Amino acid sequence: MRKTGGEPCAEIVERAPWFHNLHLPDGTQTAPEHPLGDFPAFKWAAIAPHIPDELHGWRVLDVGCNAGFYSIELARRGARVTAVDIDPHYLDQARWAARQCSVHDAITFRQQPVYALAHEPASYDLVWFMGVFYHLRYPTLALDILRRKTRKLMMFQSLTMPGDDVLTPPGNLPIDARERMLESGWPRMAFIEQRLADDPTNWWAPNHACVEAMLRASGFRVRARPDHECYLCEPHGVTPVPYDEELRAAVNLSPD
């Protein structure tokens, strides 16, 4: 948490701890000793070539914006960004950082959970859904909600189980053939009852096959995998009507 010359920056220190290492215009970094390295800049470096350089006229939703790294980068490309998070600490960091980067007029910050988006009429050209899915108690509900909000693209990222094998399940698995679910590449998701990385909100770890299957089941198609655990998706098809009714009941949403 220091400027290039090594002097600490009081405004950064008073907002610590930081999970995003932001590179501010004056040379300041917010978390230069981050255990993951220059995070999330190294993720952005891999993803950025897959996102249009010109985002003027695009509306973007950043779900779980944290300190605002991605919101700031997308605003720099011309997007109007709505950035939501449930943690006021992160939102304070993000608002401050957006001002330092002179993009605060392009970003609207709100404190709210992902599920509350179901009650809003707005939709977005790009939905940014990174680092949130596995923290949710009801992850597929969130995917179903965000499918309704996505017009063009969604960037999805989740903590995952190791392995990239994909087994395509049969269209109808007989009940006495469930041993196939133990095969490598079967879509599965581990439930984390206790802690992972000392975080009590790390609930889930899907494997790669499960991520792709859940995205398909929610009405997305994977266009690219720009980085480890990252999936660039586009809306595709529709989800079955019974699940639409279930979503409405889960979030107390009135029929259209």
Regions found by a protein language model. Name each.
Residues 68-72:
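Glycine-rich SAM-binding Motif I of class I
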Residues 73, 77-111:
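Class I SAM-dependent methyltransferase SAM/SAH-binding core
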Residues 58-66:
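Conserved class I S-adenosyl-L-methionine
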Residues 28-39:
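Class I SAM-dependent methyltransferase Rossmann-like catalytic core
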Residues 1-30:
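N-terminal, positively charged/glycine-rich alpha-helical extensions of SAM-dependent methyltransferases
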Residues 132:
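Hydrophobic adenine-recognition pocket in adenosine-nucleotide-binding enzymes
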Residues 114-116, 124, 128-129, 137-255:
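S-adenosyl-L-methionine-dependent methyltransferase catalytic module, highlighting the catalytic core
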Residues 37-56:
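Conserved alpha-helix/loop element of class I SAM-dependent methyltransferases that forms part
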